[in-house]
Amino acid sequence: MKNADVAIIGGGIVGLATGWQITQRFPQTSVLILEKENELALHQTGHNSGVLHSGIYYKPGSLRAINCREGIKAMKAFCTAEEIPWDECGKVIVAVDESEFGALDNIFERGQQNGVVCEMIDEARLKEYEPHVAGIRGIHVPETGIVDYRQVAVRLGERIQEKGHLIQTGAEVVGIKHHADGITLQTRAGDFTAKQVINCGGLFSDRVARLGGAHPDSKIVPFRGEYYELKPEAEHLCKSLIYPVPNPEFPFLGVHFTRMIHGGVECGPNAVWAFAREGYTKSNINLRDLLEAATYPGFLKMACKYWKTGLGEMWRSFSKPAFVEALQRLIPEIRSEHLVAAPAGVRAQALGPDGSLVDDFLIDESDRMINVLNAPSPAATSSLRIGQSIVDLLAPRIQ
């Protein structure tokens, strides 16, 4: 049995950033990271669109706003120091008709309150940034950028291991036992003990928390985001990042265009309920995941509230013409033949028992465990700052 001062469950970017922050602040503290897959960062981190978010959308004073603002600076600094490619390409949020002006104004006001560098621009200025866009007004956010978050995560893992700490892959946690002087984590790679445990289990964070004896009110419901990529001959239609004005009643940003750090342009995502927590395709069905979500009172209440929006998202999932139509609101020149299917991602969204989508980061503490129960976008951008916040919670326990 292997021992550590702190064990982290989950080898995605939040877990790895947390481990790295522990090694920076408490170099004498031994760290163990347990990852159920055979490689790091294969799920939410590995399917991330790679945007360095500015924090313009989030409620002032929220954990998302605070951590994103500080996190983007930390992420850019880390990538620069580690010579990981990133690009401050900028972003435009586009209103295509006057009915969207009110929501656009609200986003701009939030951006200013959060300290985001942003500018309201007219149609002529919009065309300077994105000549093919259809908007009549927009917000330009120059500090938004792009990066490969899996590359960042892998580098964090390398730095942790260089300091002599263990990253154990193939170690799905199947049991958690508390005892007087710590916690035993039973995994498919053997048993491990730790004085403190941090749960960064992503799509399975609520189940891990319950294994550890916690009773979170929320439950993870997986939403698949499906993408297309522009063929090379159409990539000139998008110079940076192009976003619509999002529906303020729905917690997703709408289909948009993202220029990628390694080349190419992604289009999407939609947001559809996935029938498995790792349901990257329509045919991925896990009966436990499906029944657990479908019988959860919070899910049923959410479905009643958002059924119309949900049907629209589902229609875009099954109908490429409907997906193309949504993209054409931003760039009318887009045609179906410009698009090829790209890998999907799955977002772990915490859902409350009242049907509310938890719209902020959610971190819960118990006796010897810290559970990250909700870490949606912009968690990757914010990961180094989230890790710092977790270490702040951990510090009194290990000093």
Predicted regions and their residues:
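Helix-loop-beta segment of a Rossmann-like dinucleotide-binding subdomain
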Residues: 85-95, 107, 120, 127-164, ...
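Beta1/beta-strand and adjacent pyrophosphate-binding region of the FAD-binding site
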Residues: 1-14, 32
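Glycine-rich FAD pyrophosphate-binding loop
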Residues: 23-46
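Dinucleotide-binding Rossmann-like beta1-alpha1 core, especially the glycine-rich loop
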Residues: 50-125, 135, 254-255, 276, ...
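C-terminal catalytic lobe of FAD-dependent flavoproteins
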Residues: 282, 294-297, 302-399
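Short beta-strand to alpha-helix junction loop
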Residues: 59-70, 94-104, 139-159, 168, ...
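Helical element adjacent to the flavin cofactor pocket in flavoenzyme catalytic cores
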Residues: 139-196, 200, 204-207, 382-395
